[in-house]
Amino acid sequence: MEHRVVMRRVLFSLLLLLTMVISASAQRSRSIGVAYYNVDKLYDTIPSTFYDDEAYTPQGKLHWDSEKYERKISNIAQVLDSMRMPIVMLYGVENEAVVRDIVERCAEDYAYIHRTQDYSDGLDFALLYYGDIFFPERVTSWHKALCVEGSIAGQEVAIIGNNRSSSIGVLINELGLRSGDSKIVILGSPNKLNFDKYGLSDHLAQASHAGYGNRVRGNRWEMYDRIISNLCNTTSCGVYIKHWLLSDTHTPKSTFEKGKYSGGYSNFLPVYIYLDN
């Protein structure tokens, strides 16, 4: 019964997505798409001396070799080319070389910003963007977060990727982003952030309350990643779903299923928002 409920929600989400895509296509000339994608442990095949990534090596328990790595790079590039978003925050890339491989595989012409995070798992953020749309000015690497300040169509905006960071509020204060003139877009999984205190809204809250999400936990969809901002000029927001991103069980098609290689994309689906230009 629960499986049928999950399937119905997926099918409804697909219909909802088609409506959004048609609407977004008409608006694209005046809207800017921003997406967040947790690519779920995209390691290279080289053992690190700074953290334990042994499982993601040819000799490790997952037998992570060049063929599997290249396939995942192609998979992520396929998703990015399908979305065609001018700005994409990635999380779960091991290093700059991985980011560069993704960008080189994409048909879309992305520039990128990467900073090494001091995580015990070695996973980083990277911001991909069209260089003629987003103009970065300042980059701040933070605990479990990356903030890139820049401008879109002459308007200053701070784009923050975060993964369970408990100090996003401190980052906002330190960068002086609390003023009414500061435009903020926070992408990823929030943790202990008082939205009201900073004048922020969770654009995916309504979808989450309705039972939709971007990953499956147990037998239920969960909105693990969010899009939070103080912007009012948004046209649409949602989870990016394509049939080829889903497995036969109608869950996100991941790279590994219960430790067995399945050659998929990620445990997570991308989330996105369109901003009025």
Describe the role of every protein-language-model region:
Residues 2-14:
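Bacterial N-terminal signal peptides that target proteins for export
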Residues 13-21:
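Bacterial N-terminal signal peptides
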Residues 25-105, 276-277:
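N-terminal, active-site-proximal structural segment of metallo-dependent hydrolase catalytic domains
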Residues 34-39, 76-99, 160-163, 171-198, ...:
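Active-site beta-strand/loop signature of hydrolases that rely on acidic residues for catalysis
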Residues 42, 59-71, 144-186, 243-272, ...:
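Acidic/His-rich catalytic or pseudo-catalytic neighborhoods
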Residues 61-67, 84-90, 114-115, 164, ...:
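Second-shell loop/turn segments in exported
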Residues 93-156, 160-161:
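Structured beta-strand-rich core segments of catalytic domains in phosphoester-bond hydrolases
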Residues 176-184, 191-277:
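Metal-dependent phosphoester-hydrolase catalytic domains
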